[in-house]
């Protein structure tokens, strides 16, 4: 899957980490904290975006040209 993620500066990344840590210290689960901060970033971000491809989708992206031939099963 290709997606455009907000391009964050080092300082913005640090602020996000600190916000996640703060939410976790207040009792929120890590998954909830990450999701909340990610949503806040997506909602408020006005800068550029970075195109990314997730590893699990690499096979779909590569198409059939790069697959190894399947070996026949022994009977």
Swiss-Prot record:
Pfam families referenced in this protein's UniProt entry, alphabetically: UPF0181 (PF03701)
Signal peptide stretch: none
InterPro entries: UPF0181
Entry-linked HAMAP family: UPF0181 (MF_00507)
Family as reported in the entry's similarity comment: Belongs to the UPF0181 family.
Protein's name in the database: UPF0181 protein ETA_15280
Organism phylogeny: Bacteria, Pseudomonadati, Pseudomonadota, Gammaproteobacteria, Enterobacterales
